[in-house]
């Protein structure tokens, strides 16, 4: 999405703590005009040094719902001090819409969202509030923020990812212990049966935003 809007020749520093993700990203390089440098780094540490590298824009993907409020405050303030533009993609916002509907869907979504707010390695996570919190912080720092939804829309043919998501949600709900395990198991059986019949669709809510400092408008 972002790449075609930038100059043909680009350099990206890719930062993650998972070497497998870094290799996958490097292998997927779309053009010889794009150079990549992979950096294995635990973002729970002194990540500010990553923001101090020469950069025109900083991007994140599926991150801001996992971090704590204090981590996000450090990130936004340091980005503002460097006058960096930030593009944040795929921040989960708490919306899960499943079809066909099941009587347990709302309770399961509540349990999943509670789990999203547990510690993911950065302190208590913001979970579904991550995008809203980040946008508010950037705006308070004088940034112009443009936002929009970027929901996952998962169709009947996408059985593999549906099964993986359902199992992950069931596991999360069990960890929260707010619902009887038997009810979670029955919900999972009903939902998987709909997937097997190719009758199941999903919409999982996400938000994208770009935050631009006033100095480069």
Residue spans of the language-model regions?
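Short, hinge-like loop/turn segments at secondary-structure boundaries
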Residues: 30-32, 104-107, 164-165
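Conserved catalytic/acceptor-binding region of the Class I
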Residues: 84-149
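A short, conserved alpha-helix within the catalytic core of class I
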Residues: 46-48, 64-84, 88-91
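A conserved beta-strand element that flanks and buttresses the S-adenosyl-L-methionine
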Residues: 58-59
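Class I SAM-dependent methyltransferase SAM/SAH-binding core
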Residues: 1-48
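Regulatory N- and C-terminal appendages and interdomain linkers associated
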Residues: 24, 29, 123, 199-201, ...
């Amino acid at each position: 999405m972002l790449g075609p809007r930038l100059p043909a020749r680009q350099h990206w520093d890719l930062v993650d703590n998972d070497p497998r993700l870094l290799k996958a990203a490097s292998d997927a390089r779309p053009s010889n005009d794009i150079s990549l440098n992979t950096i294995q780094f635990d973002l729970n540490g002194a990540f500010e040094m990553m923001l101090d590298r020469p950069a025109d824009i900083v991007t994140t993907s599926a991150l801001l719902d996992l971090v704590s409020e204090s981590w996000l405050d450090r990130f936004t303030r340091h980005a503002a001090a460097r006058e960096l533009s930030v593009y944040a993609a795929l921040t989960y916002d708490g919306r899960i819409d499943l079809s066909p509907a099941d009587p347990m869907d709302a309770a399961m979504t509540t349990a999943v969202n509670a789990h999203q707010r547990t510690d993911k390695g950065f302190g208590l996570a913001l979970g579904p509030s991550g995008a809203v919190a980040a946008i508010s912080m950037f705006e308070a720092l004088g940034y112009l923020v443009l936002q929009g939804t970027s929901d996952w829309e998962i169709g009947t043919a996408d059985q593999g990812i549906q099964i993986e998501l359902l199992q992950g949600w069931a596991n999360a709900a069990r960890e929260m212990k707010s619902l009887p395990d038997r009810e979670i198991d029955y919900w999972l059986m009903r939902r998987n049966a709909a997937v097997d019949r190719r009758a199941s669709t999903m919409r999982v809510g996400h938000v994208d935003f770009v935050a631009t400092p006033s100095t480069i408008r």
